[in-house]
Amino acid sequence: MSRGGSPGCGRRIAEELRLAEDARLRLALLGRCIVKGSPAQVRKELRAELKAIDAEWRPVIARESLRKELDAIDAEWQHAITFWHISRAIIGSIELSKELDAIDAEWRPVIVRESLRKELKAIDAEWRPAIRLESAYRAIIGSIELSKELKAIDAETQHAVELRRALRTIEGRIELSRELKAIDAEWAPRIAQAKEIAQARESLRKELNDIDAEWAPKIAQAKEIAQAKAELAAATDALKRAADKLQALGKMDTTSTPGTDLIGVVTTAVTTTLAGTQPAPGTDLVGVATPSTALGQPAPSTALTSVAAEVATPSTALGV
């Protein structure tokens, strides 16, 4: 195997060239000395120079001889090395082949499954219409057969089903009756209490209705009396305002005394003042102040007397 081309080879060649150049220069110098000196002196110097050159070139010569030996060894072992490389390549290829065979053996089922899956997909795609048609046909036949079987089962078990339904209905009614009885037993006291309360309310309502029927005339009379009192109070206020107005105008020519009738005094004053301008003003005042017109009750003098007694004396009411 050759060792040329290494990084140290260039440096070694440069060193050898430098040594060769030095030897050439020395030989040239030695030649000049030979021309000038004696033969003995020249031989001595030449021998010394050659020894120096030999000593200097000995490593180079040794390296060169070693290189030649190595080249001879390389040439001798070249076939063995080539064979070794070939054997290594063969061994590597054999190992690689074994690894590939192992990988193939490992992945063969996957590859087979994948190829088989692709084939099955192709077959499915090709036979899918026929498969669908056959599936639909089988489904129709199966549904028809199932319908027949179900009808036969229904016809066979119809009586049992009806009997079971009736039994369940009876059981449900019995359970419901028990629950209702339990509820009735639980709520019986409350229902009785509610009935008693309802009866008490009914009797109380009847009593209240009787009381209302008994007190209705009195209540109506009390309402009428209250209304009459309100109307009398309004009439009294109106008469008082009229008397005050007449008194302010100086048209009151009658001195009111405790025994003087308030209505008569006011009526006379109004009649005297407004005579000829208004139609019967005294009549209007009398109509307003008359208790028989306002209340629709008899004995107006008694009502007016009671009002006058409540207001105080006529002179106090008129402010004179």
Curated annotation (Swiss-Prot):
Q: Which UniProt keywords apply?
A: Coiled coil, Secreted, Signal
Annotated Gene Ontology cellular component terms: symbiont-containing vacuole
- Give the coiled coil ranges: 191-251
Q: Which biological processes are named by the entry's GO terms?
A: biological process involved in interaction with host
Annotated compartments: Secreted
Domain of life here? Bacteria
Q: Which residues form the signal peptide?
A: 1-28
Q: Name one GO molecular function term.
A: actin filament binding
Q: Which residues cross the membrane?
A: none
Q: What does this protein do?
A: Associates with actin filament appendages that are formed in the inclusion appendages of the parasitophorous vacuole during infection of the host erythrocyte.
Q: What protein name applies here?
A: Appendage-associated protein
